[in-house]
A protein has these predicted regions:
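Cationic-aromatic interfacial patches
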Residues: 23-76
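A structural signal for short beta-strand/turn segments enriched in small hydrophobics and glycine
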Residues: 149, 155-157, 189-201
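Intrinsically disordered, low-complexity Pro/Gly/Ser/Thr-rich segments with frequent PxxP/GP/PP motifs
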Residues: 66-96
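Bacterial Sec-dependent N-terminal signal peptides
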Residues: 1-27
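Terminal connector regions
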Residues: 87-121
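Short glycine/threonine/proline-enriched tight-turn/helix- or strand-capping micro-motif at secondary-structure
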Residues: 125-150
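Acidic, glycine-rich catalytic/binding loops that coordinate metals and/or anionic ligands
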Residues: 112-116, 187, 209-276
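Zn2+-dependent peptidoglycan hydrolase active-site motif and core
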Residues: 151-185, 205-209
Length: 276
C-alpha cells in the first residue's frame, strides 16, 4: 500500500512537471492571447470609413493577407484602409481573402554579430547545450535551480498567455523567448535593460530561443509553413565577443558598452550620469 501511494505521488509530480514544461514550451509562448488583435469598421470625424486594427500588445504583429497587401500592426490603433466619403471605387477589403497574424515585424538593421549577454550574473561561468525538448533552435544554459536569470539584451516585454512565460522584443525586432523559468520578475510593457534580473531558473536552468520573423518565408504567394528563423547570438565574455561553442564554459561579462548598446544618445548620457 505504501509503495502504491509513493508511486502515485511520483506520478503526480512528474505529471505536474510535464504540464509546467509544456506551458513554457516555445510553441506555447508564441500563442496569441485572446482578442489581443481585433478589427473594427469605423467612421472618422469627417465621415470617412476606416478599417482599424487594434493591437493590445506592447509588441508588433504582422497582418499577412494571402495574395494581397500585408501590414505591420504597431501597439494601439492601426488604420489599414480608408474609404473617403462619397468615393465611388470598390472596397478591396470586401472581397474574400485568407489572413493570418504573426508575432513581430521583419527585422530592421539585423546584424548577426550584435553582442548579447549570457543570462547569468556578471562574472559567473556558464555554458550552453541544445535543448532537445524543443523542435526549434533553443539554447539551454548551465545554471542551478533557483539561480537568478538576467536579460540577455534590452527590450520590451510582450504579452503572453501565462504569467511565467517571458518574451522580449529587441530594438531590431528580434526576440528572445525565456523558457523553463520558475518565476518571472517583469510584466508586459516593461522595458528591461541588458543584465537586469528577469526571473528565477527552473529545475533544468533556463532555455532561451533567439528568433525573428523571416521575410524570406513570405517570398512566394503564401507564407511557407513556419515563418520564423532562429539563431545563436554572439555573446560578450571576459575573453571578448564570441560565438559560443556548445558545452564550453565561458566567463560572462556585462559592461557599460553592452548595456548601452540599444540606447539613444540621450539615454546613454542619463545612464552614465546615474552611475556617478
Amino acid at each position: 500500500m505504501k509503495n502504491t501511494i509513493n508511486s502515485l505521488i511520483v506520478a503526480t509530480a512528474l505529471s505536474a512537471l510535464s504540464v509546467c514544461a509544456d506551458a513554457q514550451s516555445f510553441q506555447r509562448i508564441l500563442e496569441r492571447p485572446v482578442n489581443i488583435v481585433r478589427s473594427e469598421w469605423e467612421y472618422d470625424n469627417d465621415g470617412n470609413q476606416e478599417l482599424n486594427y487594434y493591437n493590445e500588445d506592447y509588441c508588433n504583429y504582422y497582418l499577412y493577407r494571402v495574395n494581397d497587401d500585408s501590414y505591420n500592426l504597431r501597439p494601439g490603433k492601426n488604420t489599414v484602409f480608408k474609404r473617403m466619403k462619397d468615393a465611388q471605387y470598390n472596397n478591396l477589403f470586401n472581397r474574400a481573402t485568407t489572413y493570418m497574424f504573426f508575432r513581430g515585424s521583419f527585422p530592421k538593421d539585423f546584424n548577426i554579430n550584435t553582442p548579447y549577454a549570457f543570462p547569468v550574473k556578471n562574472g559567473m561561468q556558464t555554458a550552453w547545450k541544445t535543448d532537445r525538448r524543443e523542435s526549434v533552435r533553443t539554447l539551454q544554459f548551465r545554471m542551478l535551480p533557483g539561480d537568478t536569470v538576467y536579460a540577455t539584451r534590452s527590450g520590451i516585454v510582450c504579452r503572453t498567455m501565462l504569467p511565467r512565460q517571458l518574451l522580449i522584443c529587441h530594438a531590431d525586432y528580434t526576440f528572445a523567448a525565456y523558457l523553463a523559468m520558475n518565476e518571472n520578475f517583469v510584466s508586459p510593457g516593461e522595458e528591461v535593460r541588458t543584465g537586469q534580473p528577469v526571473g528565477i531558473a527552473g529545475p533544468t536552468g533556463v532555455s532561451i530561443s533567439f528568433f525573428f520573423l523571416d521575410k524570406n518565408k513570405f517570398s512566394g504567394l503564401e507564407a511557407a509553413g513556419y515563418v520564423y528563423s532562429h539563431f545563436t547570438p554572439v555573446f560578450r565574455t571576459a575573453e571578448g565577443d564570441v560565438k559560443p561553442v556548445e558545452r564550453k564554459m565561458y566567463n560572462a561579462l556585462v559592461d557599460d558598452e553592452l548595456i548601452m548598446l540599444d540606447m539613444s544618445k540621450r539615454e546613454q548620457k542619463k545612464y552614465l550620469k546615474s552611475k556617478k
